Amino acid sequence: MSQTTLKRTPLFDIIAPTGKMVDFAGFEMPVLFSSIKEEHTAVRERVGMFDVSHMGELFVSGSDALAFLQQTLSNDISKIAIGQAQYNVLCQEDGGTVDDLLVYRLDEQDYLLVVNASNIEKDEAHLRQYLTGDVLLENQSDAYGQIAVQGPKAVEVLQELTALKLEDIKFFRFAQGELAGVEMLVSRSGYTGEDGFELYMPSADASAVWNALLEADVVPCGLGARDTLRFEACLPLYGHELSATISPIEAGMGFAVKPQVKSFVGSEVLVKQKEDGPRRQLIGLELTDKGIARQDAPVLVNGETIGFVTTGTLPPTIGKAIALALVPTEYATEETFEIEVRGKKLAAKRIDTPFYRRSK
C-alpha cells in the first residue's frame, strides 16, 4: 500500500514532523518519536501520550440495544452501569475471535463500542448480520479523535487541565466534561499496564488537546512503545494473542466470556472450553540462550514442535528476551522449552505472567 492511500488521523499534521511514520492497519501512524525505550520508560515512570485515533467508534442505540449486544458480545452487558466500561470479545460461531473491544454505556439505551483499527469494517459487517428490532448501529470512527494518556503521573498532569475530579473516576469508569477547553469523554482505562486515561473528543478538537498535553510536558509516544508496554502487562493484541483461530479462553480472557450466563455467538463452543478447559493456552517464556523470539517462531519440547510464539521481544522494563507462546494445555506446565529462531533452537524456560504488574 503506498503512502498516498494510507488513512490519517486528525493528529497527523502535528505528529508527522516529529514522528517516525509507518503503515499500521492502513493508517499512517508514528512508531516512535525519540526511541521506544525512552517512551516506554516515560510511561512506566512518569506520563506519556499516544495518538490512538485510528481506533474505531461504533455507536449502538435503541430499545433493543441491550438484547443485541447480549447476543453478539461475550461478556454480560446487563452488568454495565451508565458511566462504566467493560472489556468484551466479539466471537465467531466456532469460538474464534473476530475482535476484542471496550463497551461504554453512555445512557440507558446508548452504548459506544471501541474496536481495533484493523477490524473496524469487519466488526461492523459482523454485527450487522445480527441486527433486529429497534437497534441503530452507527460507525462514527472518522468523527472522533482518541488520545491515551498513560503513566503514574497521569492524574496529576491531567487534573491541571480539567475541573472534573479525576481521582473520583475509578478504573473502567468514565465521565463526560471539559478538559483542555474541549468537551470529551474521559475514561480511566488503557493498554499499558499503568494508570491512565483514554480521552475521546471530536476530531476537530484533537490537535488542541495534544498541544495542551505537550505544554504540560507529557511525552509523545509511538506504537512501538505501546506494544512493548502492553506486552509486559500481557494484554492481548488482535492478530497475535487473539485471532480467528485463537479463542478468548485460550488467550486467557475467560473473565470476559460468560457462556454460563447467556447465549451469544460462539457460546456453545466456549462453554465447553470453560467447563473442560481449552486445548491450548498462553504461557510466558524467557530465552536462556541469546536471541529474540518473534511472532510465529516454533516452540519445541523434546525436539518436537508443539506451539508457536504470539509475541516476543526484549522489553525495556524487564530487560530480558521474553515471549508469549500458545501451546497445548498438556505442555503448559513444562519447565523447559526450545524456540526456533532463524533456524537455531534456543533454550527457554517457562516464567510467570504477567511479566509486569504495577505497584498500586
From Swiss-Prot:
Keyword annotations of the record: Aminotransferase, Transferase
Reactions the enzyme catalyzes: N(6)-[(R)-S(8)-aminomethyldihydrolipoyl]-L-lysyl-[protein] + (6S)-5,6,7,8-tetrahydrofolate = N(6)-[(R)-dihydrolipoyl]-L-lysyl-[protein] + (6R)-5,10-methylene-5,6,7,8-tetrahydrofolate + NH4(+)
Its EC number(s): 2.1.2.10
Gene3D superfamilies reported in the protein's UniProt record: Aminomethyltransferase beta-barrel domains, Aminomethyltransferase fragment, Probable tRNA modification gtpase trme, domain 1
KW Transferase (keyword) present: yes
GO biological process: one example: glycine decarboxylation via glycine cleavage system
GO cellular component, one term: cytosol
Assembly: The glycine cleavage system is composed of four proteins: P, T, L and H.
Name of the molecule in the record: Aminomethyltransferase
Organism: Exiguobacterium sibiricum (strain DSM 17290 / CCUG 55495 / CIP 109462 / JCM 13490 / 255-15)
Lineage: Bacteria, Bacillati, Bacillota, Bacilli, Bacillales
